[in-house]
From Swiss-Prot:
Positions bearing the site annotation: Required for specificity: D204
Annotated active site: H71 (charge relay system), D116 (charge relay system), S210 (charge relay system)
Domain Peptidase S1: 31-254
Keywords: Disulfide bond, Hydrolase, Protease, Secreted, Serine protease, Signal, Zymogen
Subcellular compartments: Secreted, Extracellular space
This protein's name: Trypsin epsilon
One annotated GO molecular function: serine-type endopeptidase activity
GO biological process: proteolysis
Name of the gene: epsilonTry
Disulfide bonds: C56-C72, C180-C197, C206-C230
Length: 256
């Protein structure tokens, strides 16, 4: 396990002013209550890295495009970014690629976390194989209760200071936006129409999983965005709603 307490502290301090109404964005991703998996089961999964350390996840959209969260790329230069693909382990294996450019959604708001999505263009084209594949993006939301899987190298407990070397995944259920903002859970009006929720008791994404994929029916339906703690029964994980951004993703992938 890699000790990253200092890194997490720096990130928390740097972004303290952007936390919406006391809620903690899932910076750097985490999987709580999950299981070890392999990149062959999630070949679209990538690790975003700076200075040799994993800090966010992402999803392969095409041979040279990755989808991630806008909050992952605040105050970041493209020249400092690397993306590891095709490996179950964020520290080794697969291949590492430089980043040519990226674009955050122009409507991203760090206080409310709306439009928390970004497009990254890799410097060189990826060679697809069993461990490196693009994922199709959703053009409509999955039904309430549909099974979904989120994967990543995030911490395994809320506030954790270590991240696993091995890729983890957890199975969740989709929660309709109207239900997610209802009194059943604790978010209320903080849940916006650009967001999607997913939930299972004591299971969740966590710090370090940010930007990573939520997949249902072999489609990318969500991008790990934020939440209150990790695995809290009152607070589902909150994701950028990929179907809502379908046209933006297609357009920006051509332009970035």
């Amino acid at each position: 396990m890699l000790k990253i307490a200092v890194l997490l502290s720096v990130l928390a301090c740097a972004l303290a002013g952007t936390i919406p109404d006391g809620l903690l964005p899932q910076l750097d991703g985490r999987i709580v209550g999950g299981y070890e998996t392999s990149i062959d089961a999630h070949p679209y999964q990538v690790s975003l890295q700076r200075f040799g350390s994993h800090f966010c996840g992402g999803s392969i959209y095409s041979h040279d495009i990755v989808i991630t969260a806008a909050h992952c790329l605040q105050s970041v230069d493209a020249k400092d970014l690397k993306i590891r693909v095709g490996s179950t382990y964020w520290r080794s294996g697969g291949s590492v690629h430089s980043v040519r450019s990226f674009r955050n959604h122009e409507g991203y708001n760090a206080r409310t976390m709306v439009n928390d999505i970004a497009i990254v263009r890799i410097e060189s084209d990826l060679s697809f194989r069993s461990s490196i594949r693009a994922v199709r993006i959703a053009d409509h939301n999955p039904r309430e209760g549909a099974t979904a899987v989120v994967s990543g190298w995030g911490t395994t407990e809320s506030g954790g200071s270590t991240i696993p070397d091995h890729l983890l995944a957890v199975d969740l259920e989709i929660v309709d936006v109207s239900r997610c903002r209802s009194g059943e859970f604790g978010y209320g009006k903080k849940i916006k129409d650009t967001m999607l929720c997913a939930y299972a008791p004591n299971k969740d994404a966590c710090q370090g999983d940010s930007g990573g994929p939520l997949v249902s029916g072999d489609r990318l339906v969500g991008v790990v965005s934020w939440g209150y703690g990790c695995g809290d029964v009152r607070y589902p994980g909150v994701y950028a709603d990929v179907a809502h951004f379908h046209e933006w993703i297609e357009r920006t992938a051509r332009e970035v």
